[in-house]
Regions:
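Short, acidic, Ser/Thr-enriched surface-loop or helix-capping motifs
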Residues: 89-90
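Conserved short alpha-helical interface segments
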Residues: 1-42
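Acidic/histidine-rich, metal-coordinating catalytic segments
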Residues: 121, 129-130, 136-155, 172-173
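C-terminal domain-tail junction helix/linker
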Residues: 194-246
Length: 246
């Protein structure tokens, strides 16, 4: 007969209280008497995902790519918690890469509990880096940003205040809701292989990779490059501005 570990846990923990009987606590190496339900852990991890930021609240115009200015983003993760931020415009596939060097002191000192994240993509660091690279976009080309539920975007409310760009979060385990970004991350692995320290690349080198990707012709764009498609949108905005002032 086979018994799952979950059945053993349920037989030991006091039903309804999620706690061990007192005489069993001393047997635990961690001494942890309470057992937090997985759902509670998920709720804590996703506390930054509020009802108004769900992907279901994102403007419907973002779905068919007819209206430019809707972006998807994520982290490309490498060795030793290194990362590069990737942001892709849904209509033109134009890509921005975010340099995320490790903070000073990473792995060299004890990080205080609830202190700043030093891996390079803590919430405040991520917000600042994203705002720096996206705040220069024209309003018409910065309508929304869709991200997964990673805690690196916990400062999304402040990001919206600083840039005017609302952030929406995809549903759990639904990478297809950010399909453009997922596909782009796959292309980027040609330049940033898995298992490498992504902090070894400088901001200039990362920008060169973004340029290479944005000047690669795409079948989905009628063999235009993302840079050409994005520049067309910029030109349309300029022409509309001239027509309005004229």
């Amino acid at each position: 007969m086979r018994i799952s570990h979950e059945a053993i846990y349920q037989s030991l923990y006091i039903q309804g209280r999620g706690a061990l009987k007192r005489e069993l606590v001393w047997c635990l190496r961690t001494g942890r008497a309470l057992r937090a339900p997985r759902e509670r852990s998920r709720r804590k991890a996703w506390a930054h995902v509020t009802p108004e930021t769900l992907i279901s609240e994102r403007p419907a115009e973002a779905e068919d790519r007819a209206v430019p200015g809707h972006w998807e983003g994520d982290l490309l993760i490498g060795l030793e918690r290194s990362a590069i931020g990737t942001v892709v415009e849904r209509t033109t596939r134009f890509t921005l890469l975010v340099h995320l060097p490790r903070e000073e002191g990473y792995r060299h000192k004890e990080t205080p509990k609830n202190g700043p994240a030093l891996a390079g993509y803590g919430a405040v660091t991520m917000k600042n880096a994203l705002a720096n690279i996206m705040s220069s976009l024209p309003v018409q080309l910065a309508r929304s940003l869709t991200w997964d539920r990673g805690k690196e975007m916990s400062a999304h409310a402040q990001f919206k205040i600083e840039t005017g760009i609302p952030v929406f979060f995809a549903d759990p385990q639904s990478p297809w809701q950010r399909g453009t970004n997922e596909n782009t991350n796959g292309l980027l692995r040609q330049y940033f292989p898995k298992g490498t320290d992504l902090c070894r690349w400088s901001a200039e080198e990362i920008e060169a990779v973004a340029h290479a990707l944005n000047t690669r012709p795409r079948k989905t764009l009628g063999w235009k490059t993302p840079a050409e498609a994005f520049n067309e949108q910029l030109l349309l905005l300029q022409q509309a501005g001239v027509a309005t002032t004229g």
